[in-house]
Amino acid sequence: MKKTIKRRIGKILYHVIGKRLPLSGARVSFGARKFRQFCAHLMLEDCGKWVNIDRNVTFAYDLKLGHGAGIGANCQIPSGVTIGRQGMIGIDVLMFTNEHRHDDITVPMGLQGRTEIEPIVIGDDVWIGSRSLIMKGVHIGNGAIIAAGSVVTKDVPAYEIWGGNPAHFLKSRLPGAEQTASAPKEGERRG
């Protein structure tokens, strides 16, 4: 009962005030970062310290947010997402953990319901560039970087840099590893 009341108070404060406060890095931010952090701790069951949820972020209340994680302005994060410690999510990033059903051609897609949630897991110290799309069921390994504007449709190993549509391997962050992706052969597709 106490958790439910706490969560409701957090939701009201966040949606009425927190979402509308200036960006966290603005010259005059009116304590926006600390206020949204306070709201996140009220709403989320698993929320680390020193998190930053920026302006106009929409997120599900089962979001798991690690210590020091940051979510940029205008992101949309659905149910079933975990963001590890020190994860950096750029502005306008969209995540999808399910989709519309489309199996029955005799029924409009909008009336067929949605598929089951396939969780997205983003590891520790991951940087996801602005305006990227992260699709259902994707796991992004620790230390990975996703280039801005990428569409991530499959798992990304730890300490690799991926980009493109669909996202593909660009380079490793590990010393001594192959540092660039080889050019695709004639007729071969990446991703």
PLM features: what roles do these ranges have?
Residues 82, 100, 150-151, 157:
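Flexible glycine-rich beta->alpha loop in the catalytic core of nucleotide-sugar glycosyltransferases
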Residues 129-145, 150-154:
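Beta-rich strand-turn-strand
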Residues 44-45, 153:
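Alpha-helix termination/capping residues and helix-transition junctions
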Residues 162:
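Conserved active-site beta-strand element of glycosyltransferases/polysaccharide synthases
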Residues 30-37, 58-66, 70-138, 165-166, ...:
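Flexible, glycine/small-residue-enriched loop-and-beta-strand segment within the central core
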Residues 1-43, 49, 101-105, 125, ...:
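Terminal amphipathic alpha-helical/low-complexity segments used for targeting or macromolecular assembly
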Residues 48, 139, 157:
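Short conserved AdoMet
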